[in-house]
Amino acid sequence: MESSRARRGSRARPSGHRRPLLYCALASVAVLGASATGTVYVKAQAHSGPGAVSSAAPTPSASASGEVSVESVTRSESETEWESESEAAVSVVDRDALLAKAMASVTVPGAARVSVAVLDVGSGLSAVHGTGAFDTASIVKVDILAALLLQAQDAGRHLTAGEKTYATAMIENSDNDSATALWTSVGGAAGLDAANERFGLTGTEGGDGLLWGLTRTTAADQLTLLRQVFGTDSTGSELSEASRTYLQGLMGRIAAGQRWGVSAVADGSSWALKNGWLPRTATGLWDVNSIGRVTSGGHDYLVAVLSDGNATQAKGVALVEAAAEAAMSAFTDT
């Protein structure tokens, strides 16, 4: 938390002759702490320098020598107290604390883990709960297409008809063969990691070989990716407006049986998402994830929920949706 302090200095009055008394009012504003998840205090205060007097006019008297004398004026106690009393505070809610409190009400069964990140698009406020890394499963398909679009932009070209066919099947229907084709096209993990470096993802690492579903990521990184997809040029998106519009459109046309997840907190059909689900053969447990943009209560939110260790896919979906609802309450129930 940063702070700024008003600095006051005093200047000694030269001896040997008298000078008219100067009156000044000093106003300082001290801002103590300012962050999206901290508390901002704005303090307005009037100060008087050492030996200052009230603003009432002095009563000078002329001597035979022409010198000017100044009567001393005693400040009242109330004036002195007023110096430190004028204060106003504007509080910015700690969303991380609210999210942690809301998530405490979510039942996480057995060996399951869950992490969630939310951004209020309008205000720019965000919150993250949980810092662990998770398998992406099929949510990485958004990242794969974003990387492909970025590479196409760099080459000054549009996607080919074949690439568009793969992209549509990969996002709308979560087709794995299409994902493998585009994963190979972008250069696998190396290509994905290079794109993610430009996107600002710092905790995501592409899966080995053709195992794109085992890419590791964090909820915070998925929120960063969503800001690339649903952001603007002014918010620093590396994707062009045309690329963003294309990807958003696909995420808004998800197959009927795959519309669960973060859509649980949306108003009607006001969502664009991608879900991921993957049974791990070593444990028999499920990775279940959901990322996307939702509109709730007239506000747009970006939401990412990651989970693993779920006994079944259905239980994972229930956990993800409960976490999304809890996360939304940290922004809407205040």
Would you name each region that the model predicts?
Residues 124-131, 271-272:
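Amphipathic coiled-coil signal-relay and dimerization helices
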Residues 124, 133-157, 170, 303:
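Active-site SXXK
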Residues 128-135, 208-211:
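A short glycine/serine-rich beta->alpha loop
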Residues 119-124, 161-175, 186-187:
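Acidic helix-start/capping segments at beta-turn-to-alpha-helix junctions
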Residues 127, 179, 312-316:
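Extracytoplasmic/secreted cell-surface and envelope-processing proteins
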Residues 2-7, 13-68, 75, 90-114, ...:
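Penicillin-recognizing serine hydrolase domain
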Residues 148, 173, 180, 184:
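Glycine/small-residue-rich loop that forms an oxyanion/phosphate-binding "nest" at active or ligand-binding sites
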